[in-house]
Amino acid sequence: MKILRKNHPLLKIVNHSFIDLPTPSNISSWWNFGSLLGLCLMIQILTGLFLAMHYTSDTTTAFSSVAHICRDVNYGWLIRYLHANGASMFFICLFIHVGRGIYYGSYVLSETWNIGIILFLTTMATAFVGYVLPWGQMSFWGATVITNLLSAIPYIGNTLVEWIWGGFSVDKATLTRFFAFHFILPFIITALALVHLLFLHETGSNNPSGLNSDSDKIPFHPYYTIKDLLGIFLLLLALMILALFFPDILGDPDNFTPANPLNTPAHIKPEWYFLFAYAILRSIPNKLGGVLALILSILILAAFPLLNTSKQHGLIFRPITQTIYWTFIANLLVLTWIGGQPVEYPFTTIGQIASITYFTIIIILMPVSNTIENNIIKL
């Protein structure tokens, strides 16, 4: 008798991707975050769908519709907080996933890596337009400040900003289109994630040793389905603790005040997961320069495959680059902290030093340490 999962046209695809997929036998828990990102995406789409059933994208009722969801809809408060904190969990998993890719040299799988960068940018865009929807003070002013950055583009900047706003300021048209974008983008992310998986399964997964593992592969199921389940339970536990005990800890108090164009908050800042990029943006006094630095802070990830000169795969046997890598992570945390601080001394100076360090590590220090380690091998 033929096994259905191996012969059915649709099940065959699922089988080759999640059941009989040949997987390196030594991949660690750092490889769990891909599946956790898939889970986060499903949670966000489901909770978002239920929120969209009760939300109204109109400037006069948006804020009160969110209050209505929390007060009057059955378990609306839970759905809303799962969605808001689910975004934070999404980005935590995303940062770890990218960090693991850098540490273990997964960027050599260039198609998978480049699709991943597009996924990262799309997720950031989705989170940004989503943050505008509750129409609180920080939502409104965050939207105004970030969209206004496009005016730095020569010649077409001002026209582009007004085109995105749908008028001469952030208003009803802006909110409506941001809601439309926020609804459609997760489905684009899902499609991109499938392409990401497709490219990954063309080459096979990387592993911690950085060595070829073709001679030592095991089926994905049951070994890694069980391993992923543990990660899933831990993620759900963390999300539930966050949503039930500390639902507003990662939010901004200003967002409990309805949007008011006549009153600017003392410190305008985005959600915590954008603070590192926001700090880089603020560290450059020139508007266009800041915007370029902001874009480059993400796009520089595409330079990793190009700047890699090491004869070894990953950092597991490379102590010099390991030290530089962890300095880079510490520097990212400093940038995140600085992004949430007011624009005054000493924070501006620290931000400028951390921003220079961010780019220096990637463009100069890592390639130099690669060359040093290559020469040490020859000795």
Curated annotation (Swiss-Prot):
GO terms for biological process: mitochondrial electron transport, ubiquinol to cytochrome c. Its cofactor is heme b. The chain crosses the membrane at residues 33-53, 77-98, 113-133, 178-198, 226-246, 288-308, 320-340, 347-367. GO terms for cellular component: mitochondrial inner membrane; respiratory chain complex III. InterPro entries: Cyt_b/b6_C, Cyt_b/b6_C_sf, Cyt_b/b6_N, Cytb/b6-like_sf, Cytochrome_b, Cytochrome_b_C_euk/bac, Cytochrome_b_N_euk/bac, Di-haem_cyt_TM. Component of the ubiquinol-cytochrome c reductase complex (complex III or cytochrome b-c1 complex) that is part of the mitochondrial respiratory chain. The b-c1 complex mediates electron transfer from ubiquinol to cytochrome c. Contributes to the generation of a proton gradient across the mitochondrial membrane that is then used for ATP synthesis. This is Cytochrome b. It comes from Akodon mollis.
